[in-house]
Design a protein with these regions (language model features):
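Cationic, low-complexity basic patches in intrinsically disordered or flexible, solvent-exposed regions
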Residues: 5, 14, 25, 46, ...
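Flexible phosphate-sensing "switch/lid" loops adjacent to ATP/NTP-binding sites
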Residues: 71-250, 264-424, 432, 439-441, ...
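Conserved glycine(s) of the Walker
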Residues: 256-257
C-alpha cells in the first residue's frame, strides 16, 4: 500500500478539490479511506484496487467544476435580466462608438471582465462571464492591453478575492484571455520610477515573448494638465503599438492606471495623425436607473471600503437636462479629463462622465422587482461580510455604518434573509451553533452541532439527504467511519475540535459512496447547491468558509465567535 498511498498524497496535493489540503487533512482522508476499505472489502487482493478507485472518483471526477444545469436552474430562478439582449446590444453599441472616431477606440474596462458574480447576483439572468462573451463577439476587432502599476508590483499587492499578487494575476489574465480566443497585445507598467521589482517583472515577461511598455510617473498628476499633456509628460511614455480598432485596457484591480494609459495613447495617436477615441465601460452604477435604486445601492455596498458614492451627474444634467447616475470619482475628475481632451484633440468629445460610458445593462432589465429584491439580498450579505471583517480586525466601523444606512435606504432588514431567523431559532432550540440553508424552491433546511459533526457539516448532509429524498434519520456516513477520524485528529494531530469540518465530511461521504448507494445518491446532489443561500449562527473557520465558496453557496455568518474559541489578533 505504500506506493499507492504516496500516489494518493500526490493527487491530494496536485488537485484543487473541496479544500486546500494540509497534512492533517491528508492523514484524516487516508485514515478514513483505509478504514472504510478494511471494513467493507474482505478480499485482500481487491483492497488496493478499491482504494485507488475511490480516490479516482473523489479527486478526478468531483474536483472538476460541475456543469451548470441551465434548464433546471432557469426554471427555478426568477429572471430579471435579459442576457442575450445585453450581449447583442452592448457589442453593437461599442461598434457604434468605434465608428465615431478614426476607427480606433481605447476602451477602459472597469470591474471584472469575467467571473462578475456581483452583477449576476443583483441582476438575475446576467451570466458571470457576460462581459467576456460580449468581447468574444468583437474578437476580430479587439486586442487587450493589461495594465499594472509599478508601485503595486513593488508592494506585492494582492487581489483579495483570489489571494494572488497583481503581477501573478497579469499572467493569469493573459492565459484566461488567450484560452478564449482573445488577442492580448501587450502589458503596460504604469507609474514607473525605476522600481527594481518592476524591472525584474518586465524582464520576466519579455523572456516569455510578451511585449512590455512603460508609462512614467508624472509630477502633479492629474491636475497639472499643462505638464501632463506635453512632450515632458505623456510624450515621455512609451507608445503602445496596437493593430486593431478596439483596444481594451484592463487591469488586475483598481488604481492601476487604466485611464492614464488610454489618455497617453490618445496623445501619441494624435501626434501621429490618428483621431482615436476613448470610452469607459463599467457596469455599475447603472446610469439610467434611479440613484436610490437597490441595484445602485448594492454597488455602493460592494465598494463601501473604497468609500465610493453614487451621485447625480451634474455635467449631464446641465448639458441635456437629463438626470443620470455616476459615481463621485468620475464626476470629480471629469473637469481634469475634459481639459486633457481639449489639449490633446482640440475639443472634448464628451459633455459629461455619463457620455464617456458605453454601458447598456440598464436597458436589459426585464423584471425590475426581481432585480430590486436580489439587490436588497446582496446588501444584507454585504452587511454581514462587513460585520465579520470588523470582528476579525480587517474591517472598519465606517464601512459597517455605511452599509447600515444603505439597508435603510433600500428598505431592507436582516430578517428579510430567510436563513437568518431559521439559523438563530435552531441555535436557540439546541443551545449550540446552528446553520440554515434555503434551497432554490424556497425550502429551509437546518443543521445543528453534534458530537460528530459541526453545524455546517450537519447542514450539508441534511440538505443533500433532502435533495436526494433520503430519510433524514438515515446515516449516509457510518458513525463507525467518523470515530476513527476524530480519534486521529485529537489524539495524534493535536486538534482540539473532534467534529468533522465540511471538507472532511465531503470526503467521508465520497468514500462511503463506493459501497453505499444512498451515499452515492446524496453525492450526486452537490451541483444543486450552487446559488443556494446559507447562514450560520457563529463565524466559521476558514476551512468551512472555503468549502461553502467552492460549492457556490452564498454564505453569511452572525458576527460572533463560537463560545470558547480564542480570539485572534
Amino acid at each position: 500500500m505504500c506506493v499507492q498511498f504516496a500516489g494518493m498524497i500526490f493527487l491530494i496535493q496536485s488537485r484543487n478539490i473541496f479544500f486546500e489540503a494540509g497534512a492533517e487533512r491528508i492523514c484524516c482522508i487516508l485514515f478514513t479511506c483505509n478504514f472504510t476499505v478494511r471494513n467493507n472489502i474482505m478480499d485482500e487482493e481487491l483492497k488496493d484496487y478499491y482504494v485507488l478507485q475511490i480516490f479516482r472518483k473523489v479527486f478526478c471526477e468531483h474536483s472538476k467544476e460541475q456543469p451548470r444545469e441551465r434548464g433546471r436552474k432557469d426554471r427555478m430562478k426568477k429572471i430579471g435580466f435579459d442576457n442575450d439582449k445585453y450581449l447583442k446590444m452592448q457589442s453593437e453599441h461599442i461598434r457604434e462608438r468605434i465608428s465615431k472616431f478614426d476607427n480606433k477606440l481605447y476602451l477602459e474596462f472597469g470591474g471584472k471582465l469575467f467571473d462578475d458574480y456581483h452583477a449576476s447576483r443583483v441582476l438575475p439572468g446576467f451570466e458571470p462571464d457576460s462581459k467576456l462573451r460580449m468581447l468574444m463577439q468583437l474578437s476580430d476587432q479587439a486586442e487587450i492591453v493589461i495594465v499594472i502599476g509599478a508601485p503595486d508590483i513593488e508592494k506585492n499587492k494582492v487581489r483579495g478575492d483570489l489571494g494572488i499578487t497583481y503581477d501573478e494575476d497579469v499572467l493569469r489574465l493573459m492565459n484566461e484571455f488567450t484560452s478564449r480566443g482573445l488577442y492580448v497585445g501587450s502589458v503596460c507598467i504604469t507609474r514607473y520610477s525605476g522600481q527594481n521589482s518592476a524591472d525584474a517583472f518586465k524582464k520576466r515577461l519579455e523572456k516569455l515573448g510578451i511585449k512590455v511598455y512603460v508609462l512614467y510617473n508624472i509630477p502633479g498628476y492629474p491636475s497639472n494638465t499643462s505638464l501632463i499633456v506635453s512632450d515632458e509628460g505623456y510624450g515621455k511614455n512609451d507608445y503602445i503599438e496596437t493593430t486593431r480598432p478596439l483596444v481594451v485596457i484592463t487591469a488586475p484591480g483598481p488604481g492601476s492606471g487604466k485611464m492614464a494609459t488610454c489618455l497617453s495613447q490618445l496623445y501619441h495617436e494624435y501626434k501621429r495623425g490618428i483621431s482615436a477615441g476613448y470610452a469607459k465601460f463599467e457596469t455599475f452604477p447603472i446610469w439610467n436607473i434611479p440613484l436610490k435604486h437597490p441595484v445602485n445601492l448594492a454597488y455602493e455596498a460592494a465598494t463601501a471600503d473604497l468609500n465610493d458614492v453614487n451621485m447625480i451627474d451634474p455635467f449631464h444634467l446641465e448639458a441635456y437636462g437629463q438626470t443620470t447616475v455616476n459615481y463621485n470619482r468620475d464626476v470629480e475628475i471629469f473637469p481634469v479629463v475634459q481639459a486633457m481632451f481639449e489639449k490633446i484633440m482640440g475639443e472634448c468629445p464628451y459633455k459629461s462622465p455619463t457620455d464617456m460610458g458605453v454601458n447598456m445593462a440598464g436597458n436589459c432589465i426585464v423584471d425590475d422587482e426581481v432585480c430590486q429584491e436580489a439587490s436588497r439580498q446582496e446588501i444584507i450579505r454585504r452587511y454581514y461580510k462587513s460585520m465579520d471583517a470588523l470582528m476579525s480586525g480587517t474591517g472598519t466601523e465606517e464601512e459597517v455604518y455605511k452599509i447600515e444606512l444603505l439597508l435603510k435606504q433600500a428598505h431592507a432588514t436582516l430578517e428579510d434573509r430567510k436563513v437568518v431567523p431559521a439559523a438563530l431559532e435552531r441555535e436557540k432550540e439546541t443551545g449550540a451553533p446552528a446553520a440554515a440553508m434555503e434551497l432554490e424552491d424556497g425550502r429551509i433546511i437546518t443543521g445543528k452541532t453534534s458530537d460528530l459533526l459541526g453545524a455546517s457539516s450537519a447542514l450539508l448532509l441534511n440538505v443533500l439527504k433532502e435533495l436526494a429524498g433520503i430519510d433524514h434519520q438515515k446515516h449516509v456516513i457510518s458513525p463507525d467511519a467518523i470515530h476513527p477520524i476524530q480519534e486521529l485528529k485529537t489524539d495524534y494531530l493535536g486538534s482540539k475540535n473532534p467534529r468533522l469540518h465540511m471538507d472532511e465530511t465531503m470526503i467521508a461521504l465520497s468514500i462511503s459512496a463506493a459501497t453505499n448507494p444512498e451515499a452515492r445518491l446524496a453525492l450526486e446532489q452537490f451541483p444543486k447547491l450552487k446559488g443556494c443561500q446559507a447562514h450560520t449562527s457563529v463565524m466559521l473557520s476558514s476551512v468551512d468558509v472555503l468549502s461553502f465558496r467552492k460549492l457556490g453557496v452564498e454564505l453569511t455568518c452572525e458576527p460572533k465567535f463560537e463560545q470558547g474559541k480564542k480570539l485572534q489578533g
